[in-house]
Each structure stands twice: as C-alpha cells, then as structure tokens.
Amino acid sequence: MIVAVSPQLDLAVSAFFFRDNRFYLGDWGFFPFLRRGLPEIFIGIAAAFGLIWGWGLLRRRWLWGINTKVMLLTTGSMLLGPILIVNGIFKTFWGRARPYQIIEFGGNKNFTSPMVISNQCDWDCSFMSGHTAVIFWSLALALLLPHRYRKWGISAVIILGIATGIARIAQGSHFVS
C-alpha cells in the first residue's frame, strides 16, 4: 500500500542492490538457485502430492487427508492464482518493465508506478513475481501436512517466500511492490 502511494520507494529499494552498473547480488549465494531451480522443485512437490492422491484413489485409502476434494482445491488454486492471475494476466498484460530494464538502472525502458498499466514490457514483465506466487501458493500444501509437521511446513514456506521476494528484488527482476 505504501508503495502505491509512493512509487519512488520502488526505485530506492532497487537502488540499494544496484552498484557499479549492475545488480551486484544477482549471482550471489543461493539467489541463482531461487531463480532457476526453485520453481521446478515446487512443481515436483506438487507432483508428489498428486501421486499421493493417485495412490489414495487406487487404494481407496487417503493419506494425510489428500482426497479428490483437496486435490481439486489445491490444483484449482494453483491454476487460478500463480498460473492464470499472476503469470497469465499481470505478467502478460500489465506491461511494467523489470528494474534492470529501466533507464535508472542502465536499461532503456521507463519506470512506471505499480498501479499503472504500461507499455514498457511486452512479455514476462515485472509485476508480479511468479516465483514468489508459486511459493506462497504452496502454503496450501503445507496445510495438508500431518499436524506435527504443519507448523514447520508453514514457517518454511513463509521464510522461503520472503527470501525469494528479496532475492528477486536483489537480482533486479522485481520491484518491492
């Protein structure tokens, strides 16, 4: 909400990670893994839940409560949230350039407010982070874990989601908004 009122905060936060004409933390530590490997891991985790559901369907015995209703809900929320709304609509049609693409950070595109539909990006744009959306979607999966693991699963998803958001900002791929 603060960023919508003061879009300059987006530039200030991104500038914190921009030194010597580059986003200097882009290849630091586990940040490249977050960009390249993490989505595949979460797809694998979702596939594992699908296999658990399939096993339960064949055996007529549900493991961890993962039944057809649960699978429809989790799959539907993935299709609706991260895939359709975030990647299919916002990233495709919002047109907001990524930080590394804008003039302020050595690119040739104009900075635009997060609340303004723009023409500065044609495809795979900055607003919103698909990586972070997929990770936070996995909260639905964490809620399916047995009670003794659920708190740890939810905590892990929240920490990983925040870390991924920070990493994507540090890489110059997304603004804080």
Residue ranges and their predicted role:
Residues L38-W53, H131-L145:
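Hydrophobic alpha-helical transmembrane segments
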Residues A12, G37-G44, V70-L73, K151-I159:
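Alpha-helical transmembrane segments of integral membrane proteins
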Residues M1-G50, G88-P99, I103-N110:
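N-terminal transmembrane-helix/juxtamembrane module of multi-pass inner/ER membrane proteins
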Residues V5-S6, L51-L63, A142-Y149:
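Structural signal for the C-terminal ends of transmembrane alpha-helices
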Residues W55-F93, I154-A156:
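Interfacial segments of alpha-helical transmembrane regions
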Residues T112-S177:
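Membrane-embedded catalytic cores of phosphoryl/pyrophosphoryl-handling enzymes
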Residues I2-A4, L79-I85, I159-I169:
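Aromatic-anchored segments of alpha-helical transmembrane domains
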Residues G26-G37, W62-I66, D122, L145-W152:
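Juxtamembrane loop-transmembrane helix junctions in multi-pass integral membrane proteins
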